[in-house]
């Protein structure tokens, strides 16, 4: 059983997909699987996935008719085998040490959710940037290296990134919570974040460096 399951929805991202897949294939932490959900792509995304899956058995492909981002994530969640789960968007990419850093942190603290820094890449200027929203600096330093819950950050709750991709989740927690992404609903990320956040007493944060690029 892999330690980490990466859920990767894929829909018409041939231009960016190789960069994303390379960032996963070359992780310093190797005990993971990538559940690639081909959500009815009409471009060469599926053939790119098949190329990587033929060379690396950690990449699994599930193809379905288009259900949208939430539907693809939910399908991926049905196939998770790892102890921990991370969501990655297929036009983004991870730093090569991301899974190693996150795994070590969540194991050390035994958290249900580990939130981490991410950054924006401007394709025009080719510059990276962070914001208070992405770097998690709104979370008080007293909560560093410990678990906390939503009550501890209730005054800044709406300033914390609700994106699903900058979090590592304990899979058993997600299953016990029984929460999936709502389909055919706007702001599905927001719904998912608050539903899981309100159900745990064990949230932690990794702010040493940005590990995700979008």
What positions do the PLM features span?
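Short alpha-helix within the catalytic core of nucleotide-sugar-dependent glycosyltransferases
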Residues: 18-22, 46-50, 82, 95-107, ...
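Donor-binding/catalytic cores of nucleotide-activated saccharide
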Residues: 69-70, 90-207, 212-214
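A conserved acidic beta->alpha catalytic loop
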Residues: 23, 38-48, 65
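Short beta-strand/loop segment that forms part of the nucleotide-sugar
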Residues: 31-40, 60-65, 89-90
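Residue-level preference for short helical/loop micro-motifs built around acidic side chains
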Residues: 15-18, 31, 43, 47, ...
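Short aromatic/hydrophobic "clamp" motif used to bind/position activated sugar donors
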Residues: 85
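Conserved donor nucleotide-binding strand/loop of the catalytic core
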Residues: 46-81
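N-proximal low-complexity "stem/linker" segments adjacent to membrane-targeting elements
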Residues: 1-26
């Amino acid at each position: 059983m892999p330690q980490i399951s990466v859920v990767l929805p894929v829909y018409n991202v041939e231009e960016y997909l190789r960069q994303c897949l390379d960032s996963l294939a070359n992780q310093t932490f190797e005990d993971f699987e990538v559940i690639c959900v081909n959500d009815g792509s009409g471009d060469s995304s599926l053939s790119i996935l098949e190329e990587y899956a033929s060379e690396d058995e950690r990449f699994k492909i599930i193809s379905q008719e288009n259900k949208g981002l939430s539907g693809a994530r939910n399908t991926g969640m049905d196939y998770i085998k790892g102890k921990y789960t991370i969501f990655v968007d297929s036009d983004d990419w991870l730093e090569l040490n991301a899974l190693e850093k996150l795994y070590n942190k969540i194991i050390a603290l035994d958290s249900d959710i580990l939130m981490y820094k991410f950054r924006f890449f401007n394709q025009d200027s080719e510059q990276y940037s962070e914001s208070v929203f992405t770097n998690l600096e709104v979370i008080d330093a007293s909560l560093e290296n410990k678990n906390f819950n939503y009550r501890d950050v209730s005054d800044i709750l709406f300033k914390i990134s609700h994106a699903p991709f900058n979090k590592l989740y304990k899979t058993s927690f997600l299953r016990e919570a029984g929460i999936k992404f709502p389909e055919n609903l706007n702001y599905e990320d927001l719904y998912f974040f608050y539903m899981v956040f309100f159900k745990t007493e064990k949230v932690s944060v990794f702010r040493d460096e940005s590990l995700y690029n979008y």
